Amino acid sequence: MLALVSCTSADADLSDTITVNQANSITLKKIQEYNQVMLLQHPQTRGTNGGLKIAAHDIVGAFSGINAGKAIAGLFGIATGGTGSAATIIGCGIIGGAAASYNCYRNNKGLTTKIEDFYKYSLNIINENLKSDTTNYYIPYMYNPKIIHVKLPKGFETLKDVGEAHNKLLLGSNYSSPSTRATVVRDPVDAKIPPILTLDKEKVKIALNSKDFKNQFDKIISNLDKSTIDGELDINGYFRKNPTGSVRAENAIKEYLKLFTTYPENVDDIIQITNDYINIIESNNEFNDDEKAMIYAGLMVSIYSPQIWDNFK
């Protein structure tokens, strides 16, 4: 179970949910050194992957969604470190990543649909999952993802749900009208994601359906739009508009995006760099759990998203 520290209602500032850290970091230096080594491997085959540049929106949406979820859990008095807090944080991360992905797709295709429709659709799916201790509700939306071997540390394993549910929300929607229940399904399989098991289900539902989260959601999507030029995300511009409060975590995801958008030639490459990033972060014991959760959620989405957008064709 993801164990994160939530803000109290008295000190939860949605624009600054984590204490600002110094940009100077041993861990970041090691990450930068790792990037340099990886990009020197077969440089003649490495180039910018346009599809992965689009997937950067998904990663940042999940990263920011996790940060928003931490504050939302605190605002609604959901017990710190409990299953309710984790469910709220993960739910916000799922919606943030999937909606950012859909919004980028919508903009690139010139669709007239509203992101509001996808937001309502996503909440509907999660609300239904909160009603049950089973995952049968998700079965019609299954697809057969590539088996992944990601080594998330103890306490962060449930962040895989952010990546998996990201794809299921997208595949379960009708891209031209995501508020409907039409499906886009690939090879239905009985591969269920864990249900939302928490004694705080009603609090979690209230938090996820709150105006407070909707305001944060709107801010994330709006700032992604404002920071996107010709389909490419200006990550520095985005974090200037929508800071998380952790310069260190922001810099870590920036470094990951540099490698993610240029190095991978297949999903196995993404899994490799994801595991290596996790190892670097864990071995230096410098980032706190809140920072790790944001980063790891983004990494999980980076593995799953290219599998539905066919970024390596």
Residue ranges of model-derived segments:
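Mature extracellular/secreted ectodomains of secretory-pathway proteins
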Residues: 106-313
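Membrane-engaging insertion elements
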Residues: 17-23, 28, 35-47, 75-146
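Bacterial lipoprotein signal-peptidase II cleavage site
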Residues: 8-15
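Eukaryotic long, low-complexity intrinsically disordered regulatory regions enriched in serine/proline
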Residues: 67-72, 76
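Hydrophobic alpha-helical membrane-anchor/signal-helix detector
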Residues: 54-68, 89-98
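C-terminal motif of bacterial Sec signal peptides marking the signal peptidase cleavage site
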Residues: 3-6
